[in-house]
Amino acid sequence: MENRTRSAKLMNITAMAAFGTIGYFVAKIPLASEEIAFFRAVIAAVVILAWQLVRGRKFRLPASRKSLILLMASGAMIGFNWIFLLVAYHYTSVSVATLSYYFAPVIVMAACPLLFRERLSLKQIICFACSTAGLVLVISSGGLEGGSSNVTGVGYGLGAAVLYACIILINKSLTGIDGIDRTLLQFLVGLIVMFPYVLFKSGFHVMEAGTVGIMNLLVLGVVHTGIGYCLYFSSLGDLKGQEAAILSYIDPLVACAMSVFVMGEAMGLMQAAGGVMILGFTLYNELGGKTPSHPRQKTGCE
């Protein structure tokens, strides 16, 4: 059992570290954000389907019509969630876009009392207020240090965060479907929805991306999305909910480190302080004596 837990942690950490490097590879793909998102979904869907076939697992749809409709809606949201996040990378630094995006758990925390009649504790209220203050720091410092482009990037990052939060809330009400099956269906719906959008907005120019661009697109689809999500969902069965929630913060930490130390993007003191407040208080909300009843999980959005 101990070996299985150790192996699960290694798979989870590997997936999270990979997710944190997405911005670096996206920067090397000379295509429109919506086209990158579309081909990411296509490649990842093929990889996940192959993974399920190798494991001898049959693809199963949700038993109820309501769950199927919710899954299809969340799949459409994932497509535009990816587009918003990739556009955010274009307008601002990877670190600022990521920190804005990781406001999603705070949105979920605020929405749960309204949707699920869950009462917020004093600790949750404090964490919500401090995380929001951190976001204000990121936004205000972005406007001061990077101009309107930075603020636009934060806006797209928050738009992606709202969609991410909606998908998390939808997934909270879904039962009876495997995590990998759920993600595969969401990706398939996402690419179907994105196809006409890409066709009419920018068209398809993947063959003009060059060898380097296509190689980075393949890495994004195969490694970051296909293999990454297979590793992630395969690890959950042997991890406690709180362990998985805590390990998920490797993703934004790696993303910020890549942004500053590898990509050479600047991060101001106020942005760093705001980022610490967002991630720190969101993580603090996950910690405690009890395992969270609804641990934050990956939903195909990273």
Predicted features and spans:
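Hydrophobic/small/kink-forming positions within alpha-helical transmembrane segments
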Residues: G20, L49, G75, G79, ...
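Glycine-/small-residue-enriched transmembrane alpha-helix faces in small-molecule transporters
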Residues: M1-A44, A76, F84, G146-S173, ...
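Specific alpha-helical transmembrane segments that line the substrate/conduction pathway
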Residues: E35, V42-V46, L86-R117, A160, ...
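Helix-helix packing/entry segments at the starts of transmembrane helices
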Residues: A97-F103, I170-L191, T225-F261
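Hydrophobic transmembrane alpha-helices of multi-pass small-molecule transport proteins
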Residues: I48, Q52, M72, L120-G142, ...
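Hydrophobic/aromatic residues within transmembrane alpha-helices
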Residues: I29, I36, R40, A88, ...
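Membrane-interface interhelical linkers
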Residues: M1-A17, V46-A73, R119-I125, G143-T152, ...
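Hydrophobic residues within alpha-helical transmembrane segments
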Residues: L10, T14, F39-I43, A73-A76, ...
